[in-house]
Regions:
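Alpha-helix N-cap/loop-to-helix initiation residues
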Residues: 35, 79-80, 104, 225, ...
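Radical SAM [4Fe-4S] cluster-binding motif and immediate context
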Residues: 152-311, 316-318
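Residue-level marker for beta-strand->alpha-helix junctions and adjacent short loops that shape enzyme
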Residues: 10-11, 78, 104, 125, ...
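Conserved strand-to-helix beginnings and helix N-cap segments that scaffold or border functional pockets
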Residues: 65, 83-84, 124, 226-230, ...
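Catalytic cores of alpha/beta
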Residues: 108-113, 259, 320-326
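Acidic, low-complexity intrinsically disordered segments
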Residues: 1-209
Length: 326
């Protein structure tokens, strides 16, 4: 079969979406610089008898005139209107369409109105079955893997389908998060609550094969199991000569000087941090109980003192937010 994977660009939506564009343009540039691993992972578990292509609309155009047997689309909520437009157009042309990703997983019945099938949650474990069902004319409306994929058994992503111009590549050493922050899709999805790790040697081996010199770790958080991360950092220091971007919890980092030291020695140049708010009341509102606002300054200073940057993520519009939040 001819298979096309599509990552939609919401700015191209004809019927809706945020036309102010700033957020979408930032996300789009991030995808060009450091593309998601969803489709490279699915390509890796696709039998070689099938032909796979990928289009990221942030920097590529979709050829709707080309014949595809299956079109796979993933989308977050801000991308979903454009995703539905793409799905509707391909279905009109006779292609089967599968939609997955955070929005479709949260609202599968809605997504099904625009697709022949919807994948709920992580897809690697059921992708082969889906393709087999499609070939045999038995494609189901919904696919859901009862158990989360075992990361030990998954192959490395097929990066051959990515744009060769990307400057930063992504790697994942773990999945899942045991915390239940109300705003986060990961901790509120069935498989997302199950924290899983890849063997360290799998991670370092994959990084060695990546040509880019800057690697962004796509883990939900690298401070959930700090002993694992420390072991990984030691291996990266010994075996790999590259730079890294990590993501973690600010208060865990504040208390763990050893982790900061080892991450810097491994080549980490930046920690991405979900501060979310400078109001403790707002953090309680969304169950972000791991963050302690009074420790923010101390933690940021510690990271800086170890020679690493801090990239902070914030949200605004909580019920308790006032103008002073800015």
């Amino acid at each position: 079969m001819n298979i096309l994977f599509v990552h939609p660009n919401p700015d191209l939506s004809k019927t809706g979406g945020d036309k102010r564009g700033f957020f979408h343009k930032v996300i789009g540039k991030m995808n060009v610089l450091c593309p998601p691993l969803t489709f490279p992972m699915l390509s890796a578990v696709t039998p070689r008898k099938h032909k796979v292509e990928m289009v990221d609309e942030c920097h590529q155009k979709i050829d709707f005139e080309k014949n595809y047997d299956l079109v796979g689309i993933t989308a977050m909520t801000h991308e979903i209107i454009r995703a539905y437009e793409i799905a509707d157009e391909f279905r009109k042309r006779g292609a089967k369409v599968v939609i997955g990703g955070p929005h479709a997983s949260a609202l599968p019945e809605e997504a099904k109105q625009h697709a022949d099938s919807v994948v709920i949650g992580e897809a690697e474990g059921i992708w082969f079955k889906l393709l087999e069902d499609l070939e045999n004319g038995r494609l189901k409306s919904f696919y859901f893997q009862k158990k989360p994929p075992d990361l030990t058994g998954l192959p490395a992503p097929d990066r051959n389908i990515l744009n060769r111009l990307i400057l930063v590549n992504g790697v994942q050493s773990s999945r899942g998060c045991p915390y239940r922050c109300k705003y986060c899709f990961v901790g509120n999805s069935t498989h997302g609550r199950v924290f899983r790790k890849r063997p360290v040697e799998y991670v370092t081996g994959e990084i060695k094969r990546v040509r880019q010199k800057l690697i962004n770790f796509y883990d939900t958080s690298m401070t959930i199991d700090t002993e694992y991360t420390k072991t990984l950092c030691k291996a990266l220091k010994e075996e790999v000569n590259k730079k890294f971007i990590f993501l973690g919890n600010i208060n865990t980092l504040c208390k763990d000087d050893e982790l900061l030291k080892l991450s810097r020695e491994a080549g980490c140049i930046q920690w991405n941090i979900g501060f979310e708010s400078i109001s403790q009341e707002s953090l309680r509102e969304v169950n972000k109980n791991t963050n302690k606002v009074k420790e923010y300054y101390k933690a940021v200073k510690k990271i800086h003192d170890h020679g690493m940057f801090v990239h902070g993520f914030f949200m605004f519009g909580f019920d308790h937010d006032k103008r002073t939040i800015f």
